[in-house]
Amino acid sequence: MLNMIGISPIKPIITKVDPQDARKICSFVVPDSKMGDLYLEMKHPQNGFCHSFITELRNRFHKLLGYEEFAYFNDAKDIYGLHIRVGDEYQRKGYNLGEILRLSSIIEIIENKIKNFNILSKDTAIYFHSKYKFKPDVTSVSDCDRLLKTVIEDKTPGFEKIAGKAKVLMQKIESVKSKEEQQHFCEVTNGILEEYITKAIETKTQKQHPFTSTMNMTLTDDTVYKNKEFFNDLFKKHGIDYKI
């Protein structure tokens, strides 16, 4: 069990990218996990149109267990998640390596005053990202159609009301012409998708409600602060001395 009696939480090391770059990156140790001490390090960016970072999580033998790639575009207060992955042999084994990687990006949001962390989630990772407060952020009518079909086709008892909402909305979307209407219906679609995902998580039936396509998702700084106790508890759980 993490953060046991006698195990002192370890404070992350926060440093600037370089003396001319005010952005900050972090590294930290996860003490006495199920796999022993784990070491997380954010690597320096490569310059170009955007600044790409990679966060690596390794064990005491320096074996790479998981990583996340993300990017800042110049002069933007957004982060764009490119890829997050944990080694196949460590997935769904209770090691929570993906959770540790996600906590490093929460630190990145706070320390750099980031407004939005944007990702394109693959279908099998939507529930993972939702667990850490990412929300659907669909912005095109074609994506609305594609994702609403998943909800409409779900015949599981208890999900009829949400499926009905999705069906009515899709019928309305078919006649959409103006950009203003498109934006409105995308916002409504995001609400329905969030309701659907939340219900699946609350009933612990995610496997019975799979998505079959990618989804744009966003974690905002407002959402992080509203859920700071949730994230602070996760930092404590993993022995990371950090509070929002």
Please report, for each region that a protein language model flagged, where it lies by residue.
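Terminal substrate-recognition subdomain of acyl/acetyltransferases
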Residues: L2-A22, N118-I244
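A metal-dependent hydrolase signature that marks the N-terminal structural subdomain at the beginning
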Residues: S8-K43
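A conserved beta-strand-loop-helix scaffold within acyl/acetyltransferase catalytic domains
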Residues: S33-D88
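Acidic/histidine-enriched, beta-strand-rich ligand/metal-binding domains
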Residues: Q91-K93, Y127-F128
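Conserved acetyl-CoA-binding loop-helix of GNAT-fold acetyltransferases
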Residues: R92-I107
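Short, surface-exposed basic-aromatic patches at helix termini and helix-loop junctions that form
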Residues: S104-E111, Y132-K135
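Conserved GNAT acetyl-CoA-binding A-motif
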Residues: I107-K122
